């Protein structure tokens, strides 16, 4: 290349870089200046091979001690790179020290041993609450200048912890089943003590680059109370051999100056997430998540392309999210919190985002999952069985107003959504609506327009909603909300059928001579047959038509909006025993055809017999119970 061409090439590159830089925000430029510097997390050249310290890559021999000796030797020498010959290394908790690079090269697998005794209990934060908990597989604890790199794999080996949590298949047992029966579903995530693959805690100047994490027992990559962390090119694959509960992808928790980019996430909860503590304990700590950029990532299975919350207590500010692509994630941009979380979430900017086949592209629920979010210790649990962490979890927020989260000053621009179910959803509080939300250059294709409750001051500039209904977004207790431009889709709609009345539905089901039980959801105007799915209702009516044995199951939402759980209804003992097995409390009314008035009904809250109709009416409030007709 001659000098003229070389000069021109340099000039073009400089111009391109200059244009690119001008378009970037001040926050992005500042973080790039930190993380793209050659001096960031610079490690000495010395190399330390784990094989020299006795590590065996056979996937059977526990190698924790040998790998840790290698890391410690590197740290004692002033720093260096720890390397692995190809193979699978079975390990417990490892602690990477300052000035050390853990290089997990291609062909290397570090696999978590399925034994909680191999993970020492440390002070940490779990799902927004500070407590002692098992260490992660790979830990950076109170360190600085650390790298974890390479094309290898960190295998959380999580199936053991998934089954411990909710059984196999899911929702068939485990601690989840035991705890929900006791009325403490909210405690199981903490007490199950599922080991995380990677935790960065109270550390600074950390690089996580290019490795794959799979089968996480709990949250996959957790960055807590840390500063200047760069996550680049990390792949997460948690839906291998099952579906790990709460297997978030990359979580930034009360940390600052964070850049997450070029990642590819497939998990079974929030794909990319930002958190800041939970409830009274999170408000006590009061550490925000701030100065954070998530960009140029792909998300696949999961429950949130990018989620803010539900742990919002310490607040969040100065966050930019862009260049993301969601492929099949069931929620896109997601806010979640609760009336005991508190926190101010402000100055957030989402832009240049694509979503395809995402059911709920914009889902802002600030009264999220009540069965999990509002922790109350039942009176029937003996005092000696109550754990200290339960007391922390159930501590009241005072004054109560402090627990109301506030989301404000949020901008969403240059976003394209294809094939969604519901375009917009928001639900906040009258005391603090979701307010000052600004939309610009947004295009959404959805079957339904959506609904906003307690929102104010939303502006929409060049926002197009192609809606299957052609209806505006429903507004309830809202002020100063601009509607998008709405175009009804031209796709042919199925011929609208008249909705059957409940009596007609019951009559249709009752034509089947074998039918014994008909549950009815009055809220959804729905008579239920075996296998049906319904929405939640406080009240459920159950008709028992004959004195015969029968059983059926239907499904209702668990509470987070995306998992559905069975409700089992059974009649046995020739109609004398009625059993309900469920996980959510309802007020049940049973109408039981009976030719003779029973002497008593064990388990009922109240009951009466109609001689003319030869029918018993039974009232019972509960989740799982048995009624015995004597």
Task: Locate each region found by the language model.
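Catalytic core of carbohydrate-active enzymes
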Residues: 493-495, 499-595
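Extracellular/periplasmic carbohydrate-active domains that bind, remodel
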Residues: 15, 20-498
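Exposed beta-strand and adjacent loop surfaces of beta-rich binding modules
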Residues: 359-361, 421-423, 539, 587-589, ...
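Solvent-exposed beta-strand/loop surfaces of large extracellular or lumenal domains
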Residues: 116, 600-620
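Surface-exposed interaction regions enriched in Ser/Thr/Asp/Glu
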Residues: 619-630
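Sec-dependent N-terminal signal peptides
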Residues: 6-15
């Amino acid at each position: 290349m001659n000098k003229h061409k070389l000069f021109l090439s340099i000039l073009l590159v400089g111009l391109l870089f200059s244009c690119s830089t001008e378009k970037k925000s001040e926050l992005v430029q500042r973080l790039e200046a930190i993380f793209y510097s050659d001096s960031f997390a610079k490690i000495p050249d010395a190399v330390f091979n784990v094989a020299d310290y006795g590590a065996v890559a056979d996937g059977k021999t526990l190698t924790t001690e040998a790998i840790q000796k290698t890391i410690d030797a590197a740290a004692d020498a002033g720093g260096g790179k720890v390397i692995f010959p190809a193979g699978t290394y079975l390990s417990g908790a490892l602690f990477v020290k300052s000035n050390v690079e853990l290089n997990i090269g291609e062909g290397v697998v570090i696999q978590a041993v399925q034994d909680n005794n191999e993970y020492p209990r440390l002070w940490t934060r779990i799902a927004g609450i500070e407590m002692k908990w098992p260490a992660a597989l790979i830990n950076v604890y109170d360190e600085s200048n650390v790298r974890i790199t390479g094309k290898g794999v960190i295998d959380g080996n999580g199936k053991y912890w998934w089954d411990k949590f909710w059984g196999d298949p899911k929702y068939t047992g485990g601690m989840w089943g035991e705890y929900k029966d006791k009325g403490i579903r909210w405690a199981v995530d903490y007490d199950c003590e599922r080991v995380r693959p990677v935790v960065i805690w109270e550390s600074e100047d950390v690089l996580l680059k290019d490795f794959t994490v799979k089968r996480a027992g709990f949250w996959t990559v957790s960055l807590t109370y840390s500063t200047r962390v760069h996550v680049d090119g990390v792949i997460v694959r948690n839906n291998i051999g099952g579906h790990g509960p709460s297997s978030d992808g990359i979580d930034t928790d009360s940390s600052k100056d964070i850049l997450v980019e070029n990642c590819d996430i497939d998990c079974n909860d929030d794909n990319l997430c930002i958190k800041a503590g939970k409830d009274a304990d999170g408000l006590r700590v009061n550490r925000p998540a701030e100065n954070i950029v998530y960009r140029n990532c792909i998300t696949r299975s999961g429950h949130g392309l990018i989620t803010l919350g539900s742990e919002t207590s310490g607040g969040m500010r100065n966050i930019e999210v862009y260049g993301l692509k969601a492929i099949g994630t069931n929620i896109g941009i997601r806010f979640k919190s609760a009336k005991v979380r508190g926190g101010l979430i402000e100055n957030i900017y989402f832009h240049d985002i694509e979503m395809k086949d995402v059911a709920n592209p914009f889902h802002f629920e600030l009264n999220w999952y009540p069965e999990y979010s509002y922790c109350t210790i039942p009176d029937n649990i003996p005092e000696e069985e109550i754990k200290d962490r339960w007391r922390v979890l159930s501590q009241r927020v005072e004054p109560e107003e402090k627990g109301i989260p506030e989301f404000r000053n949020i901008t969403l621009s240059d976003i394209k959504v294809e094939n969604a179910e519901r375009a917009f959803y928001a639900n906040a509080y009258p005391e603090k609506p979701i307010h000052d939300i600004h939309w610009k250059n947004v295009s959404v294709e959805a079957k339904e327009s959506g609904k906003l409750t307690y929102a104010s001051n939303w502006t929409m500039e060049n926002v197009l909603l192609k809606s299957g209904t052609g209806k505006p977004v429903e507004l309830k207790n809202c002020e100063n909300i601009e509607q998008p431009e709405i175009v009804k889709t031209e796709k042919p709609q199925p011929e609208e059928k008249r909705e059957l009345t409940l009596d007609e539905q019951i009559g249709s089901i009752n034509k089947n001579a074998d039918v014994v039980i008909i549950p009815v959801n009055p809220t959804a105007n729905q008579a239920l047959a075996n296998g049906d799915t319904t929405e939640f209702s406080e009240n459920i009516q159950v008709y028992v038509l004959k004195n015969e044995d029968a059983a059926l199951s239907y499904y209702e939402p668990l509470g987070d909006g995306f998992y559905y759980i069975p409700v089992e209804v059974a009649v046995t003992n020739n109609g004398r025993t009625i059993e309900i097995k469920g996980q959510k409390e309802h007020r049940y009314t049973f109408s039981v055809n009976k030719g003779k008035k029973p002497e008593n009904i064990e388990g009922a809250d109240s009951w009466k017999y109609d001689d003319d109709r030869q029918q018993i009416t039974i009232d019972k409030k509960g989740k799982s119970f048995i009624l015995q007709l004597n």
